[in-house]
């Protein structure tokens, strides 16, 4: 069980981040951080009919790239911790279904990734999960912003 030192949790068996992946869209490609992305798409819709479907595809591509970089498969994942800025975690739910993974939706807005890493660390340290996939998604686009 973790112990506390002030506001910090100390895990007897510290969790490990086995891999990470980051895929962005057009705006990310124009940013000063563009070189930090694994892949960039020039089409924010990723060929999809809606931006919800595009975010689902972005999450799927990123999850699969992360698993590949970790030399893992979906079978190595006990739980997917994910969220997005859509009502009811729409893109995350569809991505989880396509990956065939148990899913816990997180609603932290901009803090979703930090929330997923913190909750995931606690679950792994407590022996409740062996392999976790943590992800979040926000494409800088919507029907109103497609021409930006």
Each language-model region and where it sits:
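Conserved "HGTGT" condensation-loop signature of ketosynthase/thiolase-family condensing enzymes
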Residues: 1-81, 85-104
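Glycine-/small-residue-rich "gating" segment that lines the acyl/pantetheine channel
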Residues: 2, 6, 114-118, 142
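A short, terminal or domain-edge coil/loop segment
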Residues: 27, 36-40, 128-139
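Residues within alpha-helical segments
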Residues: 60-67, 117, 121, 146
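Acidic, glycine-rich active-site loops and adjacent beta-strand->loop/helix elements
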Residues: 83-88, 110-111, 136-139
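Active-site-proximal alpha-helical scaffold in enzymes
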Residues: 107-134
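Single conserved hydrophobic/aromatic residue that forms the stacking wall/gate
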Residues: 140-148
């Amino acid at each position: 069980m973790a112990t506390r030192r002030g506001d910090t949790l100390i895990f007897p068996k510290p969790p490990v981040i086995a891999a990470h992946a980051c895929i962005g869209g057009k705006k990310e490609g124009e940013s000063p951080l563009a070189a930090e992305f694994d892949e960039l798409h020039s089409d924010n819709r990723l060929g999809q009919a809606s931006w919800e479907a595009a975010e689902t595809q972005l999450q799927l591509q990123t999850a699969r790239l992360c698993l590949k970089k970790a030399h893992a498969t979906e079978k190595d994942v006990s739980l997917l911790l994910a969220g997005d800025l859509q009502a009811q975690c729409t893109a995350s739910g569809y991505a989880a279904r396509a990956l065939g993974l148990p899913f816990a939706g997180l609603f932290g807005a901009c803090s979703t990734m930090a929330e997923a890493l913190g909750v995931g660390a606690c679950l792994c340290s407590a022996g409740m999960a062996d392999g976790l996939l943590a992800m979040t998604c926000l494409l800088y686009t919507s029907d109103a912003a497609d021409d930006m």
